[in-house]
């Protein structure tokens, strides 16, 4: 066992040869390197698989022995200061290693086919392998200096991948936005690291925690300064994990390739912030109010992310806000002191979200055969629908990921989210109400995404919904070039599902329309589609290749079974809670005297309540977004609510207000754009004006005045001595007269 730990230092460096060899190959042998480009995908998967096997071995030893291993190399600069570099293997490290490698391998296999026709194929795999190296180095770091170095490398890789298609202005701006937003958090992290080094004199985690606890117990620290340093450390995690108010970069990060979205949202960049808080939790729990601040940021992010996901049209943006909300749950759990629940949800969410993103990538890949390569069209759920019979495997996988995120048993996220929700009651009833309500919102918007994508009919084949033109509402070329705009610029997504033939908005209609041979006749008691008299033959999406489906099927298995790792049952000598063994010893401020086990009755009582809330959210989603030829088409209960009146008008205003809030991202981006971006530009313009007109203007003005005075004097002189003597005596006389009159006035006064 000791020998296995001794060689753990090699873990971050195993994927590193791939980007190095790709770079050298493109520099020295560009033609051969490009012709053998598929070989690099195999090498990337192979090296990361070796890391995964090594990590599994370490994890098994962690579960059996609960040991912690640290190895440090010291570089002594002088007698007073030395730099120490090493690696730390503990339960948190082993969990993150398994997570990074398993998700990373699935994404790499998926990317081989997804990126096969992209000219940046080699660049993509170089970035991906370096991304894995950076994240593996981050989680094995033994001190804050190493954390910061690999933290920045993770950020660099994410910026490169977000702006992978840098020739697209939108992608370039998204990259810049991610960079600038994370600069704020990273600067705070650096200041926090320096602050705690100034307090304790150490960067090593063990020494830092021990020295700081001694200082706290002896009351030898300034609590205001300590709290400020802790908040600065936490700011780094806030930016990296897209917590409010530094969350604005995450939805725009969807401009990168879909496999990158899966990796960033599941196991790398956004997980880094959660990892940092979990690693520093022994430091945070002894600082007054910082834990409350962490939980406050978490609960705000939980609710904000869910509300912003309600009306997104882009499938990847909807999933991005879902990630933001789920990361808020993890941050809430850490702030409550429920360390096990936070890491449990990090694991289950990673596999479920990777499944959803790879499933969405499969959908986008299939839609590109219809709309061409144009993310605004291939990712737009307005143009989707009816994909169930065309991509059945993708549909099934996406449904399982959706149900998992909704919290439906026995899927993965049910077990972890239920644990966080139950712990929230012990922490704060207000936080618990918000967290439970958001669980219902999660079920609603995830079911909405599923219904709009897979159920109903393929909207891309229908004509202009406004009834004014006989052209498709998207004029789509094969290569996704700009076509005609949507006829109604401000139309809402639900409007497409509730327009009557005459163009008037209505929720309810009993008319029967025959659409075409591919869509059967339908009666629409609720959300109705306008009548399209189109009988043309269209092409349809097809299922993705096996190379893309294989990782999706593996992630289905993880989504089905990974939740059983943390089942908190321990009865009759049978302990099923593998996760608790893995995390021994762990921190839990809410269950200090508990062995992390509950009885069957308490479990079922809590589970029924959480599943009921999720089911209610799913029902509301079906109520609003159900397919137009669903089995509920004759449900007259819905039509009983049709009557228009003041209440209906008021409810529509509320609904439209919620839609505007969600679709406009809570106006937070607009606020930043107005008050920060524009404000900084105005300040820069004022500084430029002050520098040019005031700072430079004063000496320039003196020089200019001196120049003109000199010119005047020069014009007076003609080169004659008599003229010089005349002016000299004149000036002296004037001076003497002034002096005389001043003395006279002084004597008189």
From Swiss-Prot:
GO-annotated cellular components: chloroplast thylakoid membrane
MF annotations from Gene Ontology: NADH dehydrogenase (ubiquinone) activity; quinone binding
Domain of life: Eukaryota
Record-annotated membrane-spanning stretches: 9-29, 40-60, 89-109, 125-145, 147-167, 185-205, 219-239, 258-278, 290-312, 327-347, 354-374, 396-416, 425-445, 549-569, 608-628, 694-714, 725-745
Pfam families in the cross-refs: Proton_antipo_C, Proton_antipo_M, Proton_antipo_N
Protein family: Belongs to the complex I subunit 5 family.
Keywords for this protein: Chloroplast, Membrane, NAD, NADP, Plastid, Plastoquinone, Quinone, Thylakoid, Translocase, Transmembrane, Transmembrane helix, Transport
Subunit organization: NDH is composed of at least 16 different subunits, 5 of which are encoded in the nucleus.
GO biological process, one term: electron transport coupled proton transport
Catalysed reaction equations from the record: a plastoquinone + NADH + (n+1) H(+)(in) = a plastoquinol + NAD(+) + n H(+)(out); a plastoquinone + NADPH + (n+1) H(+)(in) = a plastoquinol + NADP(+) + n H(+)(out)
Class of this enzyme: translocase
Protein topology in the membrane: Multi-pass membrane protein
Function statement: NDH shuttles electrons from NAD(P)H:plastoquinone, via FMN and iron-sulfur (Fe-S) centers, to quinones in the photosynthetic chain and possibly in a chloroplast respiratory chain. The immediate electron acceptor for the enzyme in this species is believed to be plastoquinone. Couples the redox reaction to proton translocation, and thus conserves the redox energy in a proton gradient.
EC number in record: 7.1.1.-
Native source organism of the sequence: Atractylodes lancea
Protein name: NAD(P)H-quinone oxidoreductase subunit 5, chloroplastic
Gene symbol of the encoding locus: ndhF
Cell location: Plastid, Chloroplast thylakoid membrane
